[in-house]
């Protein structure tokens, strides 16, 4: 049996490496072709370039304004992720730890909002923002990402916060922490797995 298991293990390993090569091959060819001229890409799309050239990268940076696009993506992603993580975790904490009458209703409304596809409200949103002269702005895009990402984030944080023992917060309050200090010093650090999931 041992030789058979060893053969099966080797076959599985070979299959996984073959699958990895298949998945990585498009990225490899894109990278290789980025060093070729247009004529060489058409004539020899799968081979190595005859002359390694950085002209395509220079063109991308100069004509396509790649640096500006990259900075925009970086700023929008950074502030969107930070905003979603902070505001959604605070919202979920309020839903879990307070006994307001409409907490469950508001939570289910937020969860139901995840069912609404972005395509269904994309055109009305563009019309509204266009009427307010808010188009072509980083901050309005961040605001939209906050709105669309918060529902799922609240759903994730809600389940995780319910599993945190209430005694930890009560002990912190006895030591003199306010509700905000309890959240940021006790609860939020315990939410690292959920926060990393959202960031990724």
What residue spans do the PLM features occupy?
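A structural signal for multi-pass alpha-helical bundles of membrane permease subunits
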Residues: 2-200
